[in-house]
């Protein structure tokens, strides 16, 4: 009978899958173990909510078809996919060893990381397999875009496979994935994200995966990405403004890093070069001296799988076996339960979809579904509301010598604004707008004052910055840095009434950056 069941095609009938424990979750999806009765095999099902995606199913199916043609021992096998109500179910191979992140957390929880989380041989063995998978993807025109320990899975035999590519990224871009080799979509996890992906200026290619690979190497040694303690906006600012991170970045106890040698550190520094052209390819990295330390899968089986958490230890039990309807959501105590009610806006899943961080003044913003959640499809054009565009300054050629005063809608008194913000600003009830002025030079090198309002609980720093760029007031390269400093002010208005910061767009020709004269710099203040 086993031979007969293995010859059967994978079912696209929801009733043929018995959903079991939750084995992973993110902002937009839940992964559950499941038993496929016709195949007599346990699988993993990734359930992605399509309700807010508005992606063309024709385009989506084309991408799934391309993904299903990926066959490589270091890429998780996708068996089939189908739609259940407002969810896309991806059926894939279940790797019982879990993710490398599961193992990292397990080691740290047991206090066995004082001299580094994983040793060099283990890291080299895991990462060599990851490189094999990345080389395959890159040769086939695919960019993974979210390489990290949480997306590196282990089989019970010590095999290593990369998961979570293709459709996940496809959904996050609103269906705007083409077969071009350069992307401009903003997808990925901030701590692992390459600078060129953050900037959204030149576009990026497969070298973005190499940066993420370097961050992952640090994660396997230290237990976390370098800037993991910081909020997303701060991560973006640190990545763009600072020198590339190293093994030591953010690590307080340097003793834990003593056992890591020069070849490992050199490999990391090669990956973490801000200029993507200087980074090696996956094929070139495979020839690096560090990977001579790599061993076989039996080594991983013996070295880490025997002390890894079991699938039952990793799992989050579902409180009620679901029927054909209902929603899965996380409860306050971290458990999972099914609800037959309409979308629960108070659940974690609901919050992700409702997107509390979204700016209503921007109809559809280009964003990262994890970093800047929105309820609209991603990758569509921005539209500036009439009430704002009516107050925009004149074109650059008509700018006066003195800073242009751009008067936006009436503002609240600064004192009241600061008081409101310091006493619980972010609540939906407290919608007192904060008046701000952004002073920077235009393309004619003339100072320009841009006045606008920010309403806590309604606006987001990223959304407002997008409006300024859409209106032609701010260079697109400065999106992240303007948003980061706006966030800094609205979070702590009393201590940050005015900030001066360096622009990512830099200066032209022979100009010398000057923070006093705002050459290559900008100033953001509460007015």
From Swiss-Prot:
One of the Pfam families matching this protein, by short name: Pkinase
Regions of compositional bias (Polar residues) in chain numbering: 399-408
A biological process from GO: cellular hyperosmotic response
Modification after translation: Phosphorylation at Thr-185 by WNK kinases (WNK1, WNK2, WNK3 or WNK4) is required for activation. Autophosphorylated; promoting its activity.
Main location: cytoplasm
Annotated InterPro entries: Kinase-like_dom_sf (IPR011009), Kinase_OSR1/WNK_CCT (IPR024678), Prot_kinase_dom (IPR000719), Protein_kinase_ATP_BS (IPR017441), STE20/SPS1-PAK (IPR050629)
Modified residues (N-acetylserine): 2
E.C. number: 2.7.11.1
Biased composition annotated in UniProt, kind: Acidic residues: 334-348
Alphabetical UniProt keywords: Acetylation, ATP-binding, Cytoplasm, Kinase, Magnesium, Metal-binding, Nucleotide-binding, Phosphoprotein, Serine/threonine-protein kinase, Transferase
PROSITE patterns for the chain: PROTEIN_KINASE_ATP (PS00107), PROTEIN_KINASE_DOM (PS50011)
Residues that, per the record, bind ATP: 23-31, 46
Protein kinase domain residues: 17-291
Region (Disordered): 315-360, 392-427
Activity regulation (record text): Activated following phosphorylation by WNK kinases (WNK1, WNK2, WNK3 or WNK4).
Active site: 146 (proton acceptor)
Modified residues (Phosphothreonine): 185, 310
GO MF terms held by the record: ATP binding; identical protein binding; magnesium ion binding; potassium channel inhibitor activity; protein kinase binding; protein serine kinase activity; protein serine/threonine kinase activity; transmembrane transporter binding
Cofactor section: Mg(2+)
Modified residues (Phosphoserine): 324-325, 339, 347, 359, 427
Catalytic activity annotation: L-seryl-[protein] + ATP = O-phospho-L-seryl-[protein] + ADP + H(+); L-threonyl-[protein] + ATP = O-phospho-L-threonyl-[protein] + ADP + H(+)
An annotated GO cellular component: cytosol
Similarity remark: Belongs to the protein kinase superfamily. STE Ser/Thr protein kinase family. STE20 subfamily.
Reported function: Effector serine/threonine-protein kinase component of the WNK-SPAK/OSR1 kinase cascade, which is involved in various processes, such as ion transport, response to hypertonic stress and blood pressure. Specifically recognizes and binds proteins with a RFXV motif. Acts downstream of WNK kinases (WNK1, WNK2, WNK3 or WNK4): following activation by WNK kinases, catalyzes phosphorylation of ion cotransporters, such as SLC12A1/NKCC2, SLC12A2/NKCC1, SLC12A3/NCC, SLC12A5/KCC2 or SLC12A6/KCC3, regulating their activity.
Name by which UniProt lists this protein: Serine/threonine-protein kinase OSR1
Source organism: Pongo abelii
């Amino acid at each position: 009978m086993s031979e007969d069941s293995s010859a059967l095609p994978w079912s696209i009938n929801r009733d043929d899958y018995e959903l079991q424990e939750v084995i992973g979750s993110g902002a937009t999806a839940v992964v559950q173990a499941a038993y496929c009765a016709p195949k007599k095999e346990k699988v993993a099902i990734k359930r992605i909510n399509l309700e807010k995606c508005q992606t063309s199913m024709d385009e989506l199916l084309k991408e799934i078809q391309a993904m299903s043609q990926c066959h490589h021992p270091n890429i998780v096998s996708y068996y089939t996919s189908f739609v259940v109500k407002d969810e896309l179910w991806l059926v894939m191979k279940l790797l019982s060893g879990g993710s490398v992140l599961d193992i990292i957390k397990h080691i740290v929880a047991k206090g066995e990381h004082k001299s580094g989380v994983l040793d060099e041989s283990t890291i080299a063995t895991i990462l060599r397999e990851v490189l094999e998978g990345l080389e395959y993807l890159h040769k086939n025109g695919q960019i993974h875009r979210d390489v990290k320990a949480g997306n590196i899975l282990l089989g019970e035999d010590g095999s290593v496979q990369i998961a979570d590519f293709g459709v996940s990224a496809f959904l996050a871009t609103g269906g705007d994935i083409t077969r071009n080799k350069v992307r401009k979509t903003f997808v990925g996890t901030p701590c692992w994200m390459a600078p060129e992906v953050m900037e959204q200026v030149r576009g990026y290619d497969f070298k973005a995966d190499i940066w993420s690979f370097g961050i992952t190497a640090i994660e396997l040694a230290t237990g976390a990405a370098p800037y993991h303690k910081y909020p997303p906006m701060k991560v973006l600012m640190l990545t763009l403004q600072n020198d590339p991170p190293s093994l030591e970045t953010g690590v307080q106890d340097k003793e834990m890093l003593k056992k890591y040698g020069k070849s490992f550190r050199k490999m990391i520094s090669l990956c973490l070069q801000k200029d993507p052209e200087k980074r090696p390819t996956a094929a070139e990295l495979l020839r690096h001296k560090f990977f001579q330390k790599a061993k076989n899968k039996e080594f991983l089986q013996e070295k880490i799988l025997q002390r890894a958490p079991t699938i039952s230890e990793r799992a989050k039990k579902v409180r009620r076996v679901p029927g054909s309807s209902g929603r899965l959501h996380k409860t306050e105590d971290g458990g999972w339960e099914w609800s037959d009610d309409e979308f629960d806006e108070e659940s974690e899943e609901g919050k992700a979809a409702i997107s509390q961080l979204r700016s209503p003044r921007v109809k559809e913003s280009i964003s990262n579904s994890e970093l800047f959640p929105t309820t609209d499809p991603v990758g569509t054009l921005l539209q500036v509301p009439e009430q704002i565009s009516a107050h925009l300054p004149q074109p650059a050629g008509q700018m006066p010598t003195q800073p242009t005063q751009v008067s936006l809608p009436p503002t609240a008194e600064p004192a009241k604004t600061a008081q409101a913000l310091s006493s619980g600003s972010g609540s939906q009830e407290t919608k007192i707008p904060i008046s701000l002025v952004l002073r920077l030079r235009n393309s004619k090198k003339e100072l320009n004052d841009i006045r606008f309002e920010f309403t806590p609980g309604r606006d987001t720093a990223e959304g407002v910055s997008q409006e300024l760029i859409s209106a032609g007031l701010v260079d697109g390269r400065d999106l992240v840095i303007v948003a980061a400093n706006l966030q800094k002010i609205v979070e702590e208005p009393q201590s940050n009434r005015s900030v001066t910061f360096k622009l990512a767009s830099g200066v032209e020709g022979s100009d010398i950056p000057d923070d006093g004269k705002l050459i290559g710099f900008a100033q953001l203040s509460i007015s």
